[in-house]
Amino acid sequence: METRTFLMTSSYYPPYHFGGDAVHVKYLSEELVKLGHEVHVMFSIDGFKYKKPDFNGSLENNEKRNGVDLYPLQSPLGKSDLYFTYLTGRSSYIKSRFSGLLKEIKPDVVHHHNIFFLGYNVLKKYGKYANLYTAHDYWLICQRFDLMKYGQNNCEHKNCFYCTLLSKRFPQIWRNSKSFMEVLGDIDTIIAPSNFMKDKLSESLPIKPNIVNIPNFVPRLPEDIRDSNYSNYFLYVGVLERHKGICNLVKIFKEIGMGIDAKLIIVGTGSLKKKIEEYITKNKLENKVFVMGWVSNDMLWSLYKDALALVMPSIWHENNPIAALEAISTGLPVIGTNNGGLGEIIEKIDRELIIKEDGLKGVITNFKKPYSKNKIKQVYDQFYSFEGFLRDYMKLIGDVQT
């Protein structure tokens, strides 16, 4: 197979990250390296410090991890550069670093991911490379990135200016600029991990770029997954934020905890972590609901393996969440709402596991149907394996470059 040089751009990169989008970048980069490709990743350590103020570390300007060349962005202006990038959509520091990397490594493919900390200027095409963008969230069409109107409900009728103000953010005037429109036109292809995302972008983008649906993937399981030492539990994996529906899930265990013959284990952290822990203590749920925070990869696989089901009670329009794919790869069923592209995943197992927000209580209470782990793993093999992703990804690159 022909080998190529890739440059990935991303706001985050593990372990300096918070969500599944950065995990996807890591998975993709490392799998490409295993195949003999050369992969470089440019990401914002300033952005990570902004979201995690207690982080005091620093990184080298270039370091190699698992065969991937990493370029952490650390502006001399620190947070000020982030604010300027947010307000203007561009950063001279980031543009300079990006241009320098293009000249140095001469990539065949530049693949952009979540770039809200980098600015839209990196989308501009400066050479003959394939210029790709994966829409991990709704940043291209929504200043909040999540299509949550006023941060409360899914946006059905746009009122971006007032939504921005009520969300306590400054309006990004550059979104209506000619330069932003021109840069969008420089993207060769937008990868939408869900059909829902593809449809939303097609409806809302001011230009009509080429958009293809290629679902995310997760690597194959480790050969030996240990026992978690937990049993009879539902599992939640994700950030602890309102839009993920985690508060609704914990509330169900408070209201009918004795009617649910299982525990709830919560893996993840976020702004609601302390509030959830206080709620558990206040309502004496310590023997029913457990908040584990972030855990090691080995422990996470063990928890997937031993759980009854992964529960994803999302309020917002999910895209193609990595946690759901990880669960399926272990043979674990997924219970979740039909918001966004989440239902596209769950229906491949059983449509009865797709629930409305007010139906979550009934599904969890009555969850007794046995599911074949092997059949669920077949869903992974068919739709969410790296082999399937690679086939579509390389075909896309070949089409762009011809």
Residue ranges of model-derived segments:
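Carbohydrate-associated surface elements
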Residues: 196, 217
